[in-house]
């Protein structure tokens, strides 16, 4: 029986299947001149590629369609941008994850440059879109090292949904954890919980289901407590365990199944369709 030929596909479909972005997002990447095929910039949306022959890259990073999606977590240290490429040459998270081994790997959501902790990566574009969609209400847990100690009245403002410049934040789960010895021991490697400059400070646990830019910092500043350091240790069902700062690990089957349940996908169902032509 003759081997089946892999079907050439539209470039934006290839990018979506490689987990780079959604189909529409892939089109924007193309029209902005960030996509190359065999070293040549391609902006025409009708362009096709052969996954077995053509070399496709976005911002210089080669993309490919993996047989199975890849899922991993990084324990991000401070001082790295959550981007795959920085025009100014600053350190980025791409320096710490195996993009050469897993082409198409990208972060789901962002952490500020000075924020540490759990950052989830995948080649599964569909899962990424679902997890970031507001309707999924994916909870994220942070511990903030802040100047001063918020009062119960101030914490209640966060629990009720505090007004920010860009609109009200959804209600958050917050509590003071400064006296939690286990929490302080856990955060010691990140430098959280240490006093400095003679200023009184505290550790505040913050759990939110939104993902606005600088959201936790803005929320705490709105109650007059500046964030000195911020660390994230959960993202949905994922917990930052077994990963030293600056290192990564692949997710377990149980963790992937938990993510699939979070987005309403049957555990074990692969979003990657076969590349071979079907009759």
What are these regions (language model features)?
Residues 2-279:
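Basic, flexible Lys/Arg- and Gly-enriched helix-loop patches that mediate nucleic-acid binding at interfaces
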């Amino acid at each position: 029986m003759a081997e089946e030929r892999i079907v050439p596909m539209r470039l934006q479909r290839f990018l979506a299947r490689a987990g780079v972005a959604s189909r529409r997002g892939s089109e924007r990447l193309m029209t902005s001149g960030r996509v190359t095929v065999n070293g040549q910039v391609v902006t025409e949306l009708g362009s096709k590629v052969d996954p077995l022959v053509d070399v496709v890259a976005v911002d210089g990073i080669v993309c490919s369609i993996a047989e199975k999606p890849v899922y991993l977590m990084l324990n991000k240290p401070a001082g790295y941008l959550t981007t795959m490429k920085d025009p100014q040459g600053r350190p980025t998270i791409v320096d710490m994850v195996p993009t050469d081994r897993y082409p198409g790997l990208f972060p789901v959501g962002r952490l500020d440059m000075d924020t540490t902790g759990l950052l989830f990566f995948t080649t599964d574009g569909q899962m990424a879109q679902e997890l970031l969609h507001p309707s999924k209400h994916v909870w994220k847990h942070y511990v903030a090292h802040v100047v001063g100690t918020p009062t119960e009245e101030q914490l209640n403002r966060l629990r009720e949904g505090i007004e920010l410049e860009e609109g009200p934040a959804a209600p958050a789960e917050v509590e003071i954890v400064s006296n939690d010895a286990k929490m302080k021991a856990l955060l010691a490697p990140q430098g959280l919980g240490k006093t400095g400059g003679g200023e009184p400070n505290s550790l505040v646990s913050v759990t939110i289901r939104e993902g606005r830019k600088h959201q936790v910092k803005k929320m705490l500043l709105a109650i007059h407590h500046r964030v000195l350091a911020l660390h994230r240790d959960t993202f949905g069902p994922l917990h930052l365990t077994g990963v030293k700062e600056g290192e990564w690990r692949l997710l377990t089957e149980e963790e992937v199944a938990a993510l699939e349940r979070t987005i309403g996908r049957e555990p074990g169902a692969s979003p990657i369709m076969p590349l071979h032509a079907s009759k």
